[in-house]
Regions:
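AMP-dependent adenylate-forming
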Residues: 5-28
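Conserved pre-ATP/AMP-binding loop-to-beta segment of ANL
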Residues: 15, 136-153, 160, 183-184
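Conserved AMP-binding/adenylate-forming
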Residues: 25, 40-86
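Conserved AMP-binding A3 loop
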Residues: 28-30, 149-176
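Structural detector for helix-capping/boundary residues
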Residues: 30, 53, 89, 101, ...
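Short amphipathic alpha-helical/adjacent loop interface patches that line ligand
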Residues: 36, 40, 79, 168, ...
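Structural core segment of the AMP-binding/adenylate-forming
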Residues: 45, 74-141
Length: 184
């Protein structure tokens, strides 16, 4: 089972169980599934995100980052989390290289992206995810396991950072390996 299939399973079978606890606040599986559905509708209907499009995220670890990841997976889009500890020039390089259609930024990082001035990338606050309810319930797209899901960058120790695409299958195998290693 892939990310959204697992979320759907747990939201159906244990809707009130805790999926995420962040800063002392619990989010149930049903609430997380609702947020993902809302974000999926926002991304597809209001932002025009389709399979293969890249969606970047700049911010600290936050539940919204996971919501965007799950929404991207359900649309066949590619999630591109950006390291929150980089310099402006490094962000400029990564955005030019990754060519995201859209970049979500936490408010504390939005000015950095606006200063870079890459007019090809729409920059939105993570708060926008839930601003406009979807006109209809946009269900998940059927996405093959070979579809790229995650675009991450190497540290660039021997030069510029290099983009690495991970498929849905690769992400799932990593999750399963972590479950085995950490016994959860």
């Amino acid at each position: 089972m892939y990310l959204n299939e697992q979320l759907d399973h747990w939201a159906s079978n244990t809707p009130d169980s805790q999926a995420i606890v962040f800063e002392g606040k619990a989010i149930s599986f049903a609430q997380l599934a609702g947020k993902v559905a809302c974000a999926r509708g926002f991304l597809s209907e209001h932002c025009g995100i389709r399979a293969g499009d890249r969606v970047a995220y700049l911010g600290l670890n936050h539940p919204d980052m996971l919501v965007i990841l799950f929404a991207c997976e359900s649309l066949g889009a590619i999630f591109n989390p950006l390291n929150s500890r980089l310099a402006r020039e490094e962000y400029a390089f990564l955005l030019a290289n990754a060519e995201p259609k859209l970049c979500f930024a936490e408010p504390s990082f939005a000015d950095i992206l606006h200063d870079i001035g890459n007019g090809d990338v729409e920059i939105l606050s993570t708060g926008n995810l839930y601003d406009k309810p979807a006109g209809r319930d946009r269900s998940a797209t059927s996405v093959p396991s070979s579809q790229p899901l995650l675009l991450v960058y190497t540290s660039g120790t021997t030069g510029r950072p290099k983009g690495v695409l991970l498929s849905r299958f690769a992400v799932q195998v990593n999750i399963e390996n972590c479950q085995d290693l950490f016994q959860f």
